[in-house]
Each structure stands twice: as structure tokens, then as C-alpha cells.
Curated annotation (Swiss-Prot):
Residues 28-38 have a biased composition (Basic and acidic residues). This is Replication protein E1. Residues 28-60, 160-197, 637-662 are annotated as: Disordered. HAMAP family: PPV_E1 (MF_04000). One of its GO terms (biological process) is DNA replication. The modification Phosphoserine is found at residues 94, 98, 111. It is an enzyme of class 5 (isomerase). A motif (Nuclear export signal) lies at residues 110-119. ATP-dependent DNA 3'-5' helicase required for initiation of viral DNA replication. It forms a complex with the viral E2 protein. The E1-E2 complex binds to the replication origin which contains binding sites for both proteins. During the initial step, a dimer of E1 interacts with a dimer of protein E2 leading to a complex that binds the viral origin of replication with high specificity. Then, a second dimer of E1 displaces the E2 dimer in an ATP-dependent manner to form the E1 tetramer. Belongs to the papillomaviridae E1 protein family. Its main location: host cell.
């Protein structure tokens, strides 16, 4: 420590001597290579502390280091421009000036007016491609991890929790849902493999991430076909809405843990009546294919949430659709794989698989018979095409003819023909009955017995004498000329329409409206009815009746025009009319006075405290009314059906079948 070589002398300050000493020590160490003594090491270790750590760059300006730093920044910016330009060239036309080099683009340089003579100007913005490349399923597919360094994903990761992102489709990792969290699928000691990072462009990573998200379903469909040997769409039918419910669902889940893939075979059983499960391994993990029949109908969202909880897999890694119920190849696939050792089956096989695969069910299939459909429509009194199509389709699971109807390509024609034939049969059946037989026939269709007293009490409430009403009603039903029209007159809200509509509903009549009087066919419904109703006749309507419908009120033969048919001559059925105008008091309609029988409803319609009608007029009460006053109304006595049974068999439009001997 006595060596003072290299110092400036005694006249130097202590600080300058210290600086000189350290300089000498550094020179000696570099020249001779001698290591400092142990006490010097101890002093240096002791001097290392917070007081000697310098965080401020107090170097003099112009020492030359900022030049290298500026050069590095320029080189990095140039590399970034090259990477961004490489990505943009895939999705947008080249601009006139390139950001990489300030030279004009070659196409503009060769022909400056080339852009002006184009028929359609190309947009400068990036466009979404209709068909993506097949190797861009997850954005970065088929990246060889052994041939070169991986890209550093940290700078382009936006939603990860650990700062990592899966860059290889076959690396044994599974990318999570929206957050992008990855989980190690590969075996080993749990340590992450060391990769050499290189600088990556943020814009390129963002575009690749978007491509991966938009092509995710296509990638899953491709992986399914690669593993199972057939397309996923061959087994399913598509539901556009995720809210549509169904009992049967086909689910394919990718990237499942091995333990959970085996455990789902037991976990799914309490929720379903049938489960067909196949488990295969792939580079993403385990792939689980399931055909599940739940105990209750579920929609796609409910199924996805339930399986996501059981399998710990995001919903974006699932393909969920209902199965094809009428596809023979699809049913045969589930049937054959159920017998192999690669599947685990729980529960009873669905009937749509059994029906298309079992020999017995195949032999039971028959051709569609229109007469059976007509018989069904006749028995259930269905003449509306939409109602018949819906109700008959519901029988497909239990009725072979209904199943054949659904398998036919002429369903609309069959429905139309069946309704047409049913209307013909109904019209012919009605035409052969007189009024007494028709009333008895309509009464037999009513279930239960009612009370006739509310009808009488309602008439007395309006001060209508029951005996005169009964006499007029008797001649009305018999169709006696000049007595076949009943008019119910009174102010509003007195129950006129309520009374007439209840009677019309029991007798199966029709309603005609004066609003359609401009048409020549507005009286056509009267051709197919036993009784008619003209509700709320106004003064214009009475003038029309007085001018054109006197014969109809008489109950005589009239001629009715029907659409696309010849004119029909028939006896006009009895007619009920409700009105707020008294036709008997107006001299304009004096010729109608002898043709109508008028009853006045004076009082307001009575209601209970709950808002229900005080007097109930339903089919059961009208049935009891007619049965009670059958003799008073001079209706013909029906045959002794209660003692001798029905004299004729029910109508059948289906041919009889001979018993087949074994």
C-alpha cells in the first residue's frame, strides 16, 4: 500500500489521489495479471452497497455510444417495416409507395396510368378471404419445432395469464378459450422446454390470432374427419339456433385430459337415458365422441355448459349438433360402432337406430296409404291441412303409415288430397241427415251432461216468453217457409251474439259476413251447413236482404254462386240474424215483416264478480236442452239405439284386410 507510483504528488487532493490509485490498480491488474490481495477483496465486497450504486448516466455528451443505439433503433424499425409489409401483401394491394423502400411500386412504375384504366378500382383496405388456406386452422399450423427457433409469443399475447401462447398445433398443448391460457398435455417431468426466442412482429401475431379464431370450427371438422374417417356433418343435422331443444345430441370434444375422458363414461350416466361414447387420442389430447339422449330436452347452450364443467374444456373446443334421425348410414354407423370394443354404451338404444338397423323393423315398413290418413282425419274431424299435417306427423313413432308419410316426397299433395276427401265425406254424411238426425248426431259428440235451465233463465232475464220462443224455434228447425229466420234485436252488450254463437257452435253451423257482400261468393258457406248466422246486420245489410235475399228468408230454393264451380241450387238453411236495428218498425223493409220472427233483448248482459257470464251457454247445456225438449220441438224420434245399438257401422274409408294364416 506504500507504492505511490502514478499519483500526482502531495499537492493533489485526497479525491484526486483516490482516483489515481484506482487507475494504477486497474493498469497493474491488466498488465501483470496479479490478483488483488485478500484484504482488497474484502474491501471491495464491503464497499458494494446502496451508496455506491449509480443509477444516473452522468457520462459526458458525445462519447460515441448514442450513435450505436440510434443505429440499433433504425435497424429494428427497418425489420419491423419488412415484417409488417410481408403480412399486408397477403391481404391488401401494394401501395404506390412502399414503407420499406421509398421507391414506387413496380406495377405503378411500369405503367403510371395503369390504375386509371382499370374497370373496377381495387380497395386499399384489407378484405376477409372467402376461403382460407387449409393449413391455417389455428393460425400457425405445421410449425417445425426442431428445424428452427420458435417465435417469441409474449409480445403479441393480449389476454394470457402466464405470458405464453401456443404456437404449434402438434406440440401437445391445448389453447384455452378467450383468455388464451394454455395447459401442458405432453408428458415428462413437468419442465417447460427451452426455446430460443427471436424478435416477432406484433401485427403479424395479431392477424394470425384472428385467422385462428375464425377458422377454429373448420379445423375441428378436419381433425374429426382425420380421426374417425368420416365427416361430422354426415352424422348430424344442423340447428341454426342455440336455443332449440332436443333430446338427442351428438357431441365431439377435443383436448380432454385422459383421466376426465375415462371418467365421463360414469359422470354422464345420471343425466341421460342413453350414452354412446368413443375416446381416441390425438396430438391435442383425448378426443371424445358421444351420442347422448338426455332425460329432458336441452338446447345447445345447456349441453355445452354441462360438458364444459364435466370435462374442463372450453366450449370453443366442442362440436354439438343433433343427430340425423332418418339417415340409414348414420344409424348404421352408431349401430356398428356400438358393437365394437372402441365404444362404451349405456342405456337402451334409441328407437330411430333400431328402426333403421333391425331386420324386423325393416320388414314392418310399409308403403304409404292415403286411405288411412283420410280415415284419421275423418275420425278426428280434421279438415284443415296444416292441422292434419302436424297431428299426423306426431304419430310417426307409433304408426307405420305415418312414418311412411314422413318418408315420402309428396307430403303436401297427400295432405291436400286427404283434407279434400275428408270434406267430401263430411258433406255427404251431413246431406243424408235431416235436422233431427243432425241434432242427435251433434249431441253424441258432446262429452258429459249439462243443465238446460241456464238457457231458459237467460231468455227470461231478457223478458222473452219461453213458450212463444219454443214455438218459433220449432218452426225454425223444421224449415217452414216464412218461418226459417230468427232475428234477435236489442242494444249493444245484451248477449245477442253470445246466445246465437253458442247455438251455432253446438249445431256446427257457419257464419256469413256482410262485409264480403261485394263478392259473388259470400253466401257459399251456406251450401255446406245445416244452420247459418248473420251477425250484426246494419241498415245497408237489411236493404241488401230486402233486395236480394227474400227467397232465402222464406226457406225456399235459392241459387248460390261458388268459386271455380257451377252455380248450386239448394234450399237455404235456417238463418239467425243479430241486429241493433228493428226491421219491423221501418217502412223501407215492410216486405220482410212476414219473413222474420223477432225477439228483443233489452237488458245488459249479466256478469259475475269474477267477470264470467252469469248464465253459462255451452255445448253440454244445449245438448241437455234439446234432449229435454225433444218432443216439444217436434223432432223425429231416433231409433232405439240404447236398446238395439247403432243400426249401422261407423263410416270406414279403409278397405278391410284378410286375416293372414301362419
Amino acid at each position: 500500500m506504500d507504492d505511490t507510483s502514478g499519483t500526482e504528488g502531495d499537492e493533489c487532493s485526497e479525491l484526486e489521489r483516490a482516483g489515481g490509485w484506482f487507475m494504477v490498480e486497474a493498469i497493474v491488474d491488466r498488465r501483470t495479471g496479479d490478483k488483488p490481495s485478500s484484504d482488497e477483496d474484502e474491501d471491495e465486497d464491503a464497499d458494494e452497497g446502496e451508496d455506491f450504486v449509480d443509477f444516473i448516466d452522468d457520462r459526458p455528451v458525445g462519447d460515441g455510444q448514442e450513435v450505436a443505439q440510434e443505429l440499433l433503433l433504425q435497424q429494428a424499425a427497418a425489420d419491423d417495416d419488412v415484417a409488417v409489409q410481408a403480412v399486408k401483401r397477403k391481404f391488401a394491394p401494394s401501395p404506390y409507395f412502399s414503407p420499406v423502400c421509398m421507391q414506387p411500386s413496380i406495377e405503378n412504375e411500369l405503367s403510371p396510368r395503369l390504375d386509371a384504366i382499370k374497370l373496377g378500382r381495387q380497395s386499399g383496405t384489407a378484405k376477409r378471404r372467402l376461403f382460407q388456406l387449409p393449413d391455417s386452422g389455428y393460425g400457425q399450423t405445421q410449425v417445425d419445432t426442431e428445424s428452427g427457433p420458435l417465435q417469441v409469443q409474449d409480445i403479441c399475447e393480449t389476454g394470457t395469464q402466464d405470458g405464453r401462447q401456443d404456437a404449434d398445433e402438434g406440440s401437445g398443448r391445448n389453447v384455452g378459450g378467450n383468455g388464451g391460457q394454455e395447459e401442458e398435455r405432453a408428458g415428462g417431468d413437468g419442465e417447460e422446454s427451452q426455446t430460443q426466442g427471436v424478435q416477432t412482429d406484433k401485427a403479424a401475431c395479431g392477424v394470425l390470432a384472428i385467422l385462428r379464431a375464425s377458422n377454429q370450427k373448420a379445423t375441428l371438422l378436419g381433425k374429426f374427419k382425420e380421426q374417425f374417417g368420416l365427416g361430422f356433418n354426415e352424422l348430424i343435422r344442423h340447428f341454426k339456433s342455440s336455443k332449440t331443444v332436443c333430446l338427442d345430441w351428438v357431441v365431439c370434444v377435443f383436448g380432454v385430459y385422459c383421466t376426465l375422458a375415462e371418467g365421463i363414461k360414469t359422470l354422464i350416466q345420471p343425466q341421460c337415458d342413453y350414452a354412446h361414447i368413443q375416446v381416441l387420442s390425438c396430438q391435442w389430447g383425448m378426443t371424445v365422441l358421444m351420442l347422448v339422449r338426455y332425460k329432458r330436452a336441452k338446447n345447445r347452450e345447456t349441453v355445452a355448459k354441462g360438458l364444459s364443467t364435466l370435462l374442463n374444456v372450453p366450449e370453443s373446443h366442442m362440436l354439438i349438433e343433433p343427430p340425423k334421425l332418418r339417415s340409414g348410414p348414420a344409424a348404421l354407423y352408431w349401430y356398428k360402432t356400438a358393437m365394437s370394443n372402441c365404444s362404451d354404451v349405456y342405456g337402451e338404444t334409441p328407437e330411430w337406430i333400431v328402426r333403421q338397423t333391425m331386420v324386423g323393423h325393416a320388414l314392418e315398413e310399409a308403403q304409404f296409404s292415403l286411405s288411412e290418413m283420410v280415415q284419421y282425419a275423418y275420425d278426428h274431424d280434421i279438415t284443415d291441412e296444416s292441422m292434419l299435417a302436424f297431428e299426423y306427423a306426431l304419430l310417426a313413432d307409433t304408426d307405420a303409415n305415418a312414418a311412411a308419410f314422413l318418408s315420402s316426397n309428396c307430403q303436401a299433395k297427400y295432405v291436400k288430397d286427404a283434407c279434400t276427401m275428408c270434406r267430401h265425406y263430411k258433406r255427404g254424411e251431413q246431406a243424408r241427415m235431416n235436422m233431427s238426425e243432425w241434432i242427435w248426431f251433434r249431441g253424441d259428440k258432446v262429452q258429459g251432461d249439462g243443465d238446460w235451465k241456464p238457457i231458459v233463465q237467460f231468455l227470461r232475464y231478457h223478458d222473452v216468453e219461453f213458450i212463444p220462443f219454443l214455438c218459433a224455434f220449432k218452426t225454425f228447425l223444421q224449415g217452414i217457409p216464412k218461418k226459417s229466420c230468427l232475428v234477435f234485436y236489442g242494444p249493444a252488450d245484451t248477449g245477442k251474439s253470445y246466445f246465437c254463437m253458442s247455438l251455432l257452435r253446438f249445431l256446427g253451423g257457419v257464419v256469413i259476413s256482410y262485409a264480403n257482400s261485394n263478392s259473388h261468393f259470400w253466401l257459399q258457406p251456406l251450401a255446406d251447413a245445416k244452420i247459418g248466422l248473420l251477425d250484426d246486420a246494419t241498415s245497408q245489410c237489411w236493404c241488401y236482404i230486402d233486395t236480394y235475399l227474400r227467397n232465402a228468408l222464406d226457406g225456399n230454393q235459392v241459387c248460390i254462386d261458388r268459386k271455380h264451380r257451377a252455380l248450386l241450387q239448394l234450399k237455404c238453411p235456417p238463418l239467425l240474424i243479430t241486429t241493433n236495428i228493428n226491421p219491423l218498425e221501418d217502412d223501407r223493409w215492410k216486405y220482410l215483416r212476414s219473413r222474420v220472427q223477432l225477439f228483443t233483448f233489452k237488458n245488459k248482459f249479466p256478469l259475475t264478480t269474477q267477470g264470467e257470464p252469469l248464465y253459462t251457454l255451452n255445448d253440454q247445456n244445449w245438448k241437455c236442452f234439446f234432449r229435454r225438449l225433444w218432443a216439444r220441438l217436434s223432432l223425429t224420434d231416433p231409433d232405439d239405439e240404447e236398446e238395439n245399438g247403432n243400426p249401422s257401422e261407423p263410416f270406414r274409408c279403409v278397405p278391410g284386410q284378410n286375416a293372414r294364416t301362419l
